[in-house]
């Protein structure tokens, strides 16, 4: 479903294009004059410049304007504006009923934030979401969809901006960024930015510090070419982390204060990532466009935290009040390289117009994991046991990881190499003014190696999709698609100690929908779908030898519908509404599945989700006010505990004075106590943020 939300961003999956710098700026200005949140195209669905209304697949684009209006610092702040997506844990989401963490950056695989840090938005121009099958184009594609982060690139027009932010919980942030030409002709352009923030967390003992540095250069090459080079450095230090949830009863009510933390103040999660990107686009002929891209990143994450292992009734009063704990010292080192090459050839065969895409990509990830575990009853270390923590009256600091003689503990390690590679062919056919057909085929290969034990798992398969769009009348388009999917299991899930190896995941989806633009003021998009996925690996919640156990569900079926509405109610008033209904259920647990899971709902998949964001401009005082609401229906956790429905509200005020812009945002306006998602019983539910207040001032020069 294609809800255009962008500030007229360029068509390609990256901000750069083969157009001249002057043309780039013209496109942006024209889009801002038309509407605040609408995009007309985004190549993430086809890797071509096909208009969104002609793509037989659901696509949503969240632009920078919407990110700024909502004072969104990380991607979790944007879920209300994307139908069918909700929070699962950390960077993971539920998309069309399924948990998924696979993301793209500028159309290439690899997440520098790994699995336990949440992607930040400082250097992100827009967020693109493909709903439904993406494997036939990107490989390794989850059937629910894929998220693509488009990073900011150099512009031809000089812009400089300084911003300061403050808020409750001692939140402080500042950034400086600039972009523009480096020479008189504008053939060399730059962008540089630096962002830093810090705050005391909403959970006891928790705090955070982040620093992001980003620099890029763009060079005109010949008459049609553009080369972009980019480097990003990310540092994130989280105190009192890794965070788990807060224990609940089976009805989903928190058993204690939502601020409760199982970690000590000395616990931490420190992450450092570096990313390098090179993109080159050119047009050797009028009907042929070529783009090449390569991306490298490294990620180092060190976690030292107390894992909650379950409540016991220590004082025998009939109430389980003591959370037993385990100390985990974990180090993850990831290094990855991704590359892709694409060519788009426009030809005619008789009266039929073809837009033929052919390309290939490759991805390699080296993942090293080293860990120690200290248990409560483990006295061989010659040090005190790992103390638990009281649920109702926690006393922090009675012991820390310094007291556990970790030097006496053995290390366990894994080292894997995951390779993904594929080639694809796609044809978009215009069979006249009203009828368009899209057909795509992709071959995928993979190889996962145990670099310590020497074992390996490899395989290959074909994925395909077929879709069609029919224009009923100007501004009203009907579409349908069917697609198959093939996703290799991650290298870590092949570990025999965790229950592996497992066969590759397979999927198939059927989708129909409507895309419409009414009176040039109202965009209404609807979709209905059914997705069958088999052999989905999930955590069972069981720990054997310090290793989290996995199991494969035989078949899960997700059915649902989505509605996206973007309306320019007046010249001053914009309304963005998203609604999704989903029913994801386990149909067959399979021979090695979770016991008695057949027929149960899939974890953290709400049946109903509604998001609203509206903005009203007050031109007489150069201001705008915004109001948002986010409703997520009842869900179940991984262990079947209820996760209650919730509704939260936000407000914002933005005003400009000369070159200054001032903004205030209130999130969770009525301080609703709620669970954002559920996990396993001993970990509890992840509490949603309490009311937060942010103010900021920005100066452009």
Language-model-detected regions and their locations in the chain:
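Acidic, small-polar-rich N-terminal luminal/periplasmic segments of exported/outer-membrane proteins
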Residues: 23-158, 512
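Outer-membrane beta-barrel translocator/receptor signature
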Residues: 122-125, 136-213, 221-225, 274, ...
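Acidic/polar loop-and-plug regions of large Gram-negative outer-membrane beta-barrel proteins
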Residues: 197-201, 214-283, 298-334, 381-412, ...
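Structural signature of Gram-negative outer-membrane beta-barrels, strongest in the C-terminal barrel
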Residues: 220, 334, 353-365, 412-533, ...
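Surface-exposed extracellular loop regions of Gram-negative outer-membrane beta-barrel proteins
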Residues: 235-250, 366, 469-511, 523-524, ...
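Membrane-embedded beta-barrel scaffold of Gram-negative outer-membrane proteins
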Residues: 279-283, 289-295, 299-307, 471, ...
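Gram-negative outer-membrane beta-barrel transporters
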Residues: 433-434, 530-532, 551-639, 673, ...
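C-terminal beta-signal and adjacent terminal beta-strands/loops
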Residues: 630-636, 654-701
């Amino acid at each position: 479903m294609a809800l255009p939300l962008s500030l007229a961003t360029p068509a390609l999956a990256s901000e750069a294009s083969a157009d001249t710098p002057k043309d780039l700026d013209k496109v942006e200005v024209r889009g801002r004059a038309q509407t605040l949140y609408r995009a007309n195209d985004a190549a993430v669905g086809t890797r071509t410049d096909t208009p969104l209304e002609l793509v037989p697949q659901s696509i949503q684009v969240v632009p920078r304007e919407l990110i700024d209006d909502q004072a969104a610092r990380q991607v979790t702040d944007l879920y209300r504006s994307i139908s069918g997506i909700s929070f699962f844990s950390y960077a993971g989401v539920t998309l069309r009923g399924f948990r998924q963490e696979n993301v793209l950056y500028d159309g290439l695989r690899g997440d520098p934030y790994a699995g336990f840090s949440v992607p930040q938005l400082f250097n992100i121009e827009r967020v693109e979401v493909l709903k439904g099958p993406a494997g036939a184009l990107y490989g390794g594609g989850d059937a629910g969809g894929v998220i693509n982060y488009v990073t900011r690139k150099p512009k031809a027009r000089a812009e400089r901006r300084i911003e300061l932010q403050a808020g409750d919980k001692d939140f402080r942030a500042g950034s400086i960024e600039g972009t523009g030409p480096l020479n008189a002709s504008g053939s060399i352009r730059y962008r540089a930015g630096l962002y830093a923030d810090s705050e005391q967390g909403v959970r006891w003992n928790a705090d955070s510090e982040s620093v992001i540095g980003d620099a890029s250069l763009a060079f005109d090459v010949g008459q049609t070419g553009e080369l972009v080079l980019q480097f990003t450095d990310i540092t994130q230090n989280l105190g009192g982390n890794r965070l788990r949830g807060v224990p609940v009863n089976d009805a989903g009510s928190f058993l204690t204060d939502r601020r409760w933390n199982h970690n000590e103040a000395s616990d931490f999660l420190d992450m450092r990532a570096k990313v390098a990107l090179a993109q080159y686009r050119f047009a050797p002929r009028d009907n042929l466009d070529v783009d090449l891209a390569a991306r490298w990143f490294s990620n180092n994450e060190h976690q030292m935290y107390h894992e909650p292992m379950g409540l016991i009734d220590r004082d025998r009063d009939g109430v389980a009040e003591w959370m037993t704990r385990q100390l985990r010292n974990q180090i993850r080192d990831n290094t990855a390289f991704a590359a892709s090459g694409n060519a788009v050839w426009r030809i005619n065969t008789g009266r039929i117009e073809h837009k033929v895409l052919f390309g290939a990509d490759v991805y390699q990830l080296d993942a090293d994991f080293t860990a120690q575990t200290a248990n409560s009853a483990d006295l061989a270390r010659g040090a005190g046991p790992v103390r638990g923590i009281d649920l109702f009256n926690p006393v922090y600091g009675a012991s820390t990881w310094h007291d556990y003689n970790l030097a006496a503990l053995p290390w366990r390690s894994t080292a894997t190499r995951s390779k993904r590679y594929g080639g694809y062919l796609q044809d978009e056919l215009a069979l006249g003014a009203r009828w368009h057909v899209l057909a795509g085929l992709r071959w995928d290969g993979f190889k996962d190696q145990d670099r310590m034990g020497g074992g390996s798992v490899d395989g290959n398969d074909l994925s395909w999709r077929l879709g069609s769009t029919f224009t009923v009348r100007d501004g009203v388009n009907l579409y349908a698609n069917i697609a198959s999917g093939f996703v290799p299991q991650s290298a870590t899930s092949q570990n025999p100690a965790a229950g592996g190896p497992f066969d590759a995941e397979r999927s198939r989806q059927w989708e129909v929908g409507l895309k419409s633009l009414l009176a040039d003021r109202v965009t209404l998009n609807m979709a209905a779908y059914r997705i069958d996925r088999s052999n989905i690996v999930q955590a069972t919640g069981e720990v054997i030898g310090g290793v989290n156990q996995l199991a494969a569900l035989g078949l899960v079926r997700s059915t649902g519908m989505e509605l996206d509405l973007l309306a320019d109610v007046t010249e001053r008033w914009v309304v963005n509404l998203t609604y999704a209904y989903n029913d994801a259920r386990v149909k067959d647990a399979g021979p090695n599945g979770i016991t008695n899971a057949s027929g149960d709902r899939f974890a953290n998949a709400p049946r109903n989700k509604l998001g609203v964001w509206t903005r009203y401009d007050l031109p007489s005082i150069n201001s705008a006010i915004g109001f948002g609401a986010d409703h997520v229906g009842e869900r179940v956790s991984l262990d079947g505990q209820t996760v209650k429905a919730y509704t939260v509200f936000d407000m914002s005020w933005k005003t400009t004075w000369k070159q200054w812009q001032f903004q205030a945002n209130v999130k969770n306006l009525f301080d609703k106590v709620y669970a954002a998602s559920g996990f396993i019983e001993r970990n509890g539910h992840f509490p949603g943020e309490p009311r937060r207040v942010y103010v900021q001032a920005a100066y452009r020069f």
